[in-house]
């Protein structure tokens, strides 16, 4: 029909943010006529690369919830299933909304000044790529390097190594933005340091890790660690 299907959402979170269990609350609302079981499936799929792909400080909490509610007032199609075109369009919109909310949580991270995207590509599996991405994203040394605007790819290598994944170090290539700093495990020569320094001043930084070991990938999102994060959490006092 011509009736408009709407999806709206709100989210709360700034510290103790990590996948699967965080100090995070998100509520999503829609008027689409989709049953609860299918909505649950769609939300789980949307959360995999959004709410479960972010970390502020890698710490967890029990106050973690993402919920979706529907008034079921607007018909979305005849055969309500994952194969229905209306449901597929709805899923695309839901994924965009969840990713937008998840990124806003990271931007609002305690003391955060920079938004950091970690892309792990050409991995042997999605689970391996995810493990490596979060190992780098959760590293205090990586996060403080970003805060200090230092393209320290050695710290990225450290983060990859401590993931525990079996990889060939001679195949690893690393980029900060468009700038290649390491290729096939060795430093890139004749780097334009001035351009890289200018890039590191940006509010949003992308680190690409190419494992050259497969065809799978994973992208996660985090922020830098600043003095403000220390001040916020050092000043916090338990009331008990």
Task: Please provide the spans of the model-predicted regions.
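A structural signal for small-residue-enriched, beta-sheet-centric alpha/beta enzyme cores
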Residues: 1-240
